[in-house]
A protein has these predicted regions:
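C-terminal auxiliary extensions adjacent to catalytic cores
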Residues: 2-34, 38-46, 72, 147, ...
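Conserved, non-catalytic sequence blocks in retroelement Pol enzymes and Pol-derived host proteins
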Residues: 111, 140-142, 373
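Polyanion/phosphate-binding surface patch
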Residues: 50, 65, 249-250
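FAD-binding core of FAD-dependent oxidoreductases
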Residues: 53-75, 82-105, 133-155, 164, ...
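Glycine-rich, flexible loop motifs
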Residues: 1-49, 76-134, 236
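Acidic, glycine-rich active-site loops and adjacent beta-strand->loop/helix elements
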Residues: 59, 85-86, 105-106, 126, ...
Length: 502
């Protein structure tokens, strides 16, 4: 049964990700009332002729142009048309759903003043997987993405459903809905705020939270194969370093490797291991710490009002506030930090891959080939990992520093939160592939071990899951299919179950 998440006060990043993956969204009565109350304030502002940005004025550099009441609905409509200028491949279904969920959450705070029927139409589209086609590029913050969503509400634009594209008008008709006629402020609210960034950022933090466990599992398997020493993840020496993430990684490794006879065989054979093994708690732990910090920022932003202007007061005493809550500076910085952390996690995984396949250090058949020389084995898949790590370094350049000036000097500082979140997701794609390569190599290395000593129970379990998906690499064959199979395993399952205790 598909779960339903009821929006009462705020949505968390976990909830946004769940909705993007298919959970249904509903409004509580309190949330509905907040939306109704805020709209009554906007109507009062319009009735009294109180000037409010984007309500009865132009936008951007045209903010001082007063718009007559008869033209305010046209302003809302025209904003969607003029701002629908995104380019590039459309966002995926999950990304679009995350943005829409974050958008609805922003309106439900009760400071935007958009009508309830607009929000309910967004929910109907989202819950029925009738998702607007959003060009992925062309936004320094949010405008073009939001406009693509808004077009569908008025019967324009396009939607994607069951792999097919339909017109916005047909999408609404399929749900028994009619195109909306937007009122004052609604066009601006639909393109405004940080939902694009918070939606994508919610996906990023949840995806990295999933992959850090797989990274620990991959490292544990590499530890066994390479005869690593156990002191670097022992509880007492790790306690000397103050980091929640580091302590968690140490605990995970101790649990994953408990009872490993294979690892016990290597005890004391080296004074210390190379950093790609010895520093796993420190690097993986730092990534976990960065993830916790980024998640805190994303959840804080989801709990915040990011519309401009915001409305408050009451119909008897309406107030409108022009501020910069739509600026996503905190999100941009957080996503840049998360992107760098994910790139670092991929980098240390690639170094472990090299040690698994490199005959100079592995103690295993060269490049994990069963017939070295005639067969190249895992030689070039390590090059693939190195290429992805190099790409990550380029992607990890901070988007939040890109700057720029738009809208006739009115928007003269840009924080690029949405591009920062988008490139963090691109880095996570590469990280997932690199981890899949390490896990595939680690399973191959286990099969080629000369020792008959047994693996830890948990690494044995992970090995069996890998082998259920991909067989031993006996003769050279195209490896990209194997890696894709392991990527699917990483996407769809957890590294271990809660009952296993890591």
């Amino acid at each position: 049964m598909v779960p339903t998440i009821t929006l009462d006060t705020v949505l968390t990043s976990d909830a946004i990700a769940a909705i993007a993956e298919g959970a249904k969204l509903a409004l509580s009565e309190k949330a509905r009332q907040r939306i109704l109350d805020a709209r009554a304030i906007v109507d009062a502002l319009v009735d009294r002729g109180i000037r409010g940005y984007g309500i009865n004025t132009g936008v951007g550099a045209l903010c001082d142009v007063v718009i007559d009441r008869e033209e305010q609905a046209s302003l809302s409509r025209n904003l969607l048309f003029s701002h629908s200028c995104g380019v590039g491949e459309p966002l995926g279904r999950v990304e679009t759903g995350a943005i829409m969920a974050a958008q609805i959450a922003n309106f439900a705070h009760g400071y935007s003043g958009i009508r309830l029927e607009v929000v309910e139409t967004l929910i109907a589209l989202l819950n029925n997987d009738m998702l607007p086609v959003i060009p992925s590029r062309g936004s320094v913050g949010y405008l073009t993405h939001g406009a693509a969503i808004g077009l569908v509400l008025i019967g324009s634009g396009e939607c994607s459903h069951d792999g097919k594209q339909v017109s916005g008008a047909d999408a609404l008709a399929a749900l028994g809905l009619k195109p909306l006629v937007l009122q004052a402020k609604e066009g601006l609210s639909l393109i405004n705020g940080t939902p694009c960034a918070t939606g994508l950022a919610s996906l990023a933090v949840n995806r990295l939270a999933h992959l850090v466990d797989w990274a620990d599992a991959a490292a544990a398997m590499s530890y066994e194969n390479l005869g690593a020493q156990t002191d670097p993840f022992a509880e007492m020496p790790l306690s000397l370093r103050k980091s929640d993430g580091l302590q968690q990684v140490g605990k995970n490794l101790r649990t994953l490797l408990a009872g490993s006879a294979l690892l016990a065989e290597s005890a004391g054979k080296r004074t210390q291991d190379p950093l790609s093994l010895r520093a796993v708690p420190h690097v993986h732990g730092a990534v976990r710490d960065a993830l916790a910090e980024a998640r805190a920022v994303v959840d804080r932003e989801l709990a915040s009002v990011t519309d401009n202007p915001a409305v408050s007061g009451s119909p008897a005493d309406p107030k409108v506030h022009s501020q910069a809550h739509a600026v996503g500076a905190a999100l941009g910085l957080a996503m840049d930090h998360l992107a760098t952390a994910a790139a670092e996690l991929a980098a240390i995984s690639e170094r472990r891959i090299d040690r698994l396949v490199n005959p100079l250090v592995s103690g295993l058949p060269a490049f994990l080939a069963s017939g070295s020389g005639v067969e190249s084995g895992f030689m070039i898949i390590q090059s693939t990992a190195a290429a992805l790590v190099a790409e990550n370094r380029r992607l990890a350049m901070p988007a939040s520093l890109d700057g720029g000036i738009t809208s006739g000097l009115q928007e003269d500082i840009l924080t690029h939160a949405t591009p920062a979140a988008a490139k963090a997701l691109a880095i996570l794609d590469n990280l997932e592939t690199v981890l899949a390569i390490e896990l595939t190599a680690a399973a191959q290395a286990h099969d080629l071990q000369s020792s008959k000593a047994t693996k830890a129970a948990m690494t044995q379990g992970i090995y069996e899951r890998l082998r259920h998906v991909v067989p031993f690499y006996r003769d050279d064959r195209p490896m990209n299919g194997d890696i894709q199979q392991i990527r699917t395993l990483l996407k769809t399952t957890t590294a271990w179950s809660e009952s296993e205790g890591a």
